Amino acid sequence: MFNELFRKVVEAISKASKFTPEEIAACMERSYQPKKPNVTLFLDRISPSPQEDAKELLETLAGANIELIENLAIRKSSVCCDINKRAILKDVLGYIQKNREIFGNNNVGKGKRMVVEYSSPNIAKIFHIGHLRTTVLGQFIVNLLRASGYETTSINYFGDWGKQFGFVLLGYSKYGSEEELEKDPLKHLFNVYVKISADAEKNPDVDSEAKEIFRMMEEDKDEWCMNLWRRFRELSIEKYKVLYKRLNVEFDVYSGESMYNEKGKSIVETSKQIKTDEDGSKVFDLGKAGKVLVMKNDGTTLYITRDIAAAIERLEEYSPEKIIYVVSSEQNKHFEDLFGVLEMLGYDKDKFQHVSYGLVAGMSTRAGKVQLLEDIIQESTEVMKNVMMSDNNKGSFTAAEMDQTAEVLAISTLLVMDFTARRVKGYEFDIEKRARNTSGTGLYLQYAHCRLRSIETKNSNVDYNDIETIDFELIHVPKVLNLVYKLLWFEHVVEKCLEDYEPSRIVTYLQDLASSINGAINILRVLGVDKELARARLLVLSSARIVLHNGLRILGATPLNKM
């Protein structure tokens, strides 16, 4: 509906002026901020004499009496106006109510397929706060693409192969505990890895032994190693699945580097573009971009070798518009090399995209001083419990409800904390700070949603479903009209996110929307007012809740009904 509204505005302005629809669209900027005009036409972008044309256009539009626009004015060489919100009020609210949980969706990707690879932790390392970014950003992109009509395949490509497994297997033979492995495979394997890495720093022979173990794995020559590796992998994946469920993250495919070991070798052995370096290793020479090592002189493959094989298989299996990799900016060079090699092999480079992000401050893995994400979720949940207790909500929840609600609030706060800044920027993790200052946080958005749901529940006897019988003049109030206009913008914000996969766009919009809801809620009181006024007001509040709900879902949060 958003696009249709502005298409009509463009056509109406064009019809009344000397400018084509294409010219009007090219010079038009739109806004929902109350202190800015809804529409500004920057005529200096399309006219050699913008000031003269601005005066002429203002006079023309003033005489045209276009129903959809009002408050015409000139600002320097631009013509400004507002959308006549009274004219669209009924249609916007009716459209939101009709579409409800799919309001904000679009058909940009209809008939097209996308593949998104994200999370992709290493089996040998713990799942810490640094992994949160790829996981939740990747799920956001999947949610966004599906809301935009794309058939989307989500892939978790585990780091389940490589030299580090030589270290893990060697470490387990020395420091492993069957009891600890069963109890918490991720934490135990990480502790084993840290201990054997410390040994390697003191004794070079440990490093050589680990390399030899991995070489035997590559050649499938050691049954003990392979059986133990498979067990580590299975136990770890089951543990990850539990964590993913808590984060509202789901994958269509659980994959891993190990699945592409042989195919990677085959590409190296059969590719005509491959070159042998002076030391006997195999490389792709990308010219100015440098050489890309894909096989060492001892015959072992590398991470990028398996990435090449995985990318080719995905192209063949899914025929996607694009394969998106959600990985930190630390891996920029890796993906430049990967896409360069794929292009050299004859594949379209534009089929691949690296969506990067900045890092969470204070994370280190060398000394083992890293918090498990599982522990962080639990600590964050305790913080949220304290917030709920301080709001005197203890009596309205059972113990189980308190735990469940606090965890949803914790996850929501983690998500919004991660998504508030642009993804290319890093941030410092501080859940207690976010709990103390709730403005703009996940807690703030959930509170706004719960408040609206509570009003709906308390006024369940008020029937606003028959839009045709509602008296919309009862809510011709500036704050309400601006709020409803802002609700329509959700469609545009979702579509705009497809340009850069930037979740901060939706977070900023939802924060602003929640603020507008809080600013208008006192003049939208439902309880104890005239029946017709109650119907009109509740329709607005219900529509606002639907938009908040849908926005939270795209971000990956579970909207709460009470807190």
UniProtKB/Swiss-Prot annotation:
Coiled coil: none annotated. Transmembrane segments: none annotated. Keywords: Aminoacyl-tRNA synthetase, ATP-binding, Ligase, Nucleotide-binding, Protein biosynthesis. SUPFAM superfamilies: Anticodon-binding domain of a subclass of class I aminoacyl-tRNA synthetases, Nucleotidylyl transferase. One of its GO terms (biological process) is arginyl-tRNA aminoacylation. It comes from the Eukaryota. Its EC number is 6.1.1.19. One of its GO terms (molecular function) is arginine-tRNA ligase activity. It is an enzyme of class 6 (ligase). Disulfide bonds: none annotated. PROSITE patterns: AA_TRNA_LIGASE_I. It catalyses: tRNA(Arg) + L-arginine + ATP = L-arginyl-tRNA(Arg) + AMP + diphosphate. The keyword Aminoacyl-tRNA synthetase applies. GO terms for cellular component: mitochondrion. The keyword Oxidoreductase does not apply. Pfam families: DALR_1, tRNA-synt_1d. PANTHER family: ARGININE--TRNA LIGASE, MITOCHONDRIAL-RELATED, ARGINYL-TRNA SYNTHETASE. Monomer. Belongs to the class-I aminoacyl-tRNA synthetase family. This is Arginine--tRNA ligase. It comes from Encephalitozoon cuniculi (strain GB-M1) (Microsporidian parasite).
